[in-house]
Each structure stands twice: as structure tokens, then as C-alpha cells.
Amino acid sequence: RVIIAGAGCGDYDLITMRGYEALKSCDVVIYDSLIDSRLLDFCKENAQKICVGKRAGRHSSTQEEINTLLVEKAAEGGIVLRLKGGDPFVFGRGGEEITALKAAGIPYSLIPGVTSSVAVPELAGIPVSHRGLSRSFHVITGHTADDLLPEHFESYAKCGGTLIFLMGLRNLPEIASRLIENGMGKDTPAAVISKGATPEQRAV
């Protein structure tokens, strides 16, 4: 069987207890390069560790190759842990992986992870909702699969809630320009956070 788990964002100690237990018991762990490598120390000594290197801009494995690997390893028996940065279902392609497992008849379970979209602003002292200021928050990709900006900037600029762009540092100037062009005030409070949930976190 396959367990698809979120490792949490940033430092290793943000993984959930359920994720930690899965690490200790798995026979194979297929992990992203975004996770804190110290998490692998919790695995059994004989556990097979396979890095699939998913990172924006440099993928060592395609999503299709990862899907195939999950099915193949599950067919060999034992517990296969797919460990993903943050939460598997927040821009983590977890849905694509369970679709492949369903098609192959492979049983699976899911373990949520702490998502950077909420945890990183919190660690910077920024609430994503605040009474009287923001009654909603919206999580948006900072770039699409073909490295373009997302659509619907007119809606984002006028929604009135907190906007959280993930993986958007490279496109930051254009994101800001598009929001302003579509009606967002130039004096709207904003923050840019890098290396979130680590000792190197920086916010401006």
C-alpha cells in the first residue's frame, strides 16, 4: 500500500505525528527535494530512500515517472511512503498521484501536512485572516506549469481578502504590477517571505 503524506513546510519538526509514524514504519520512501533531509533519519535502517527531486525549475523526475514508480514499488509489497513538502493537496500534485494509484488498483491512505500558505505568514507574525480587515484568504500559484502567471488578476485585485502567492518570488514584480493594473491600491500592505519556516526565514 501507499501512504501519501505531507512533510510540512520548512524545518523537519513541523511534520505531524502521523507523518512521523509513517516515516518510522515505511519500507520505501519516495521524497521530494523540498523536504528537510533530517526527516530521513527517522526511517528504518533498511528502508529504501528514493529522491524524485521535485523542485520548481529543475525536476529530476516527471510527474508521470513518479506515478509509475509509486505503482511499481507498491506492487513489490510493503509500505511505500510518498513524502511531499507542505501538504500533498496544496499545489503538491497529490491528486494526480492518487488518480494513478486508483487506476492501478493500489490501496492508499493520506496524511495531511502543514501548508506553507498558512504557516509561513504565521511564523512571520502575519495572520491570513483578521477581524475587521480580512474575512477570507486565497492561495494562488505564483507560476503555472509552463512558467506563466496565473489568470484572473482582476478577481484577485478586487476580492478583498488576503492573497497568498506560493512559489512566486521570481515573478514578484509582474504579480505586483498586474494587481495594481487591475485596481489594487498601491498602498495595500504586503510582505515577501523567503525560506519560510526555517532559521533563514526572511520577511520584508
Language model segments and positions:
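Beta-strand/loop-alpha-helix module characteristic of Rossmann-like adenine-cofactor folds
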Residues: 1-2, 99, 107-109, 115-204
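Class I S-adenosyl-L-methionine
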Residues: 1-12, 17-114, 119
